[in-house]
Amino acid sequence: MSKKKGLSLEEKRSRMMEIFFETKDVFQLKDIEKIAPKSKGITPMSVKEVLQSLVDDNMVDTERVGTSNYYWAFPSKALHARKRRLEELEKQLEDGSQRKKALQQAVDKAKVGREVNEEREDLLKELTALKGQRDQMKVEIEKYQECDPAVVEEIRNANIAAKEAVARWTGGTFGNYLISYLLTCSLTRQEPWAHHLSPSSGFSPGTACQTCYYYQQAIS
């Protein structure tokens, strides 16, 4: 034979409440410890624990008289206790429903504008195209950095250094004139210096061939 299954806590609580309802009497703990095992099958070791759980839930009343504690519970008391408990559960259910509704509204609001549609796809394509144009403009800006004042100043300083180097080579007034001319052409026309030494530029160095030679050596 299989071993008989013991009572659950709720079953013990229910059977102990039957003791109070059937007798409509007041008991001490020692009285319940005698009655519960015999009439309701509640183990003696669990009587005190079950009784205290009923007191904690306001299903059983208790009062200390002298050195003894007395316990009682009437059907009307249990009815009111169950009614209060039912009201608490209904309130919790209502609060939970309201919370669920608020969360669902928040979720629906968050979804607005994220649904996939033709207009959204077109906007995404336009955004991608604009990003591509932005990247292309960055490349173009890098190409025109020569027009930046800082870059021009850097070129000017390099030209001055080159002029001084050529002056050291030529050591003459004509060399300075030649370099000044070339510097002016380079900055205003943004063309290489060597271009202004060619015959097509209209410049005729004449007897300054040696000077031109030193100049080309200096800038090469």
Curated annotation (Swiss-Prot):
Q: Name one GO cellular component term.
A: nucleus
Q: Which UniProt keywords apply?
A: Coiled coil, DNA recombination, Meiosis, Nucleus
The source's domain of life comes to: Eukaryota
| Record Pfam families | Mnd1
Q: Which InterPro entries match?
A: Mnd1, Mnd1_HTH, WH_DNA-bd_sf
Cellular compartment(s): Nucleus
**Listed GO biological process terms:** reciprocal meiotic recombination
Q: Which segments of the protein form a coiled coil according to its record?
A: 76-147
Q: Which GO terms describe its molecular function?
A: double-stranded DNA binding
Job description of the protein? Required for proper homologous chromosome pairing and efficient cross-over and intragenic recombination during meiosis. Stimulates both DMC1- and RAD51-mediated homologous strand assimilation, which is required for the resolution of meiotic double-strand breaks.
Q: Which family does it belong to?
A: Belongs to the MND1 family.
PANTHER family attached to this UniProt entry: MEIOTIC NUCLEAR DIVISION PROTEIN 1 HOMOLOG
User: What is the name attached to this protein's record?
Assistant: Meiotic nuclear division protein 1 homolog
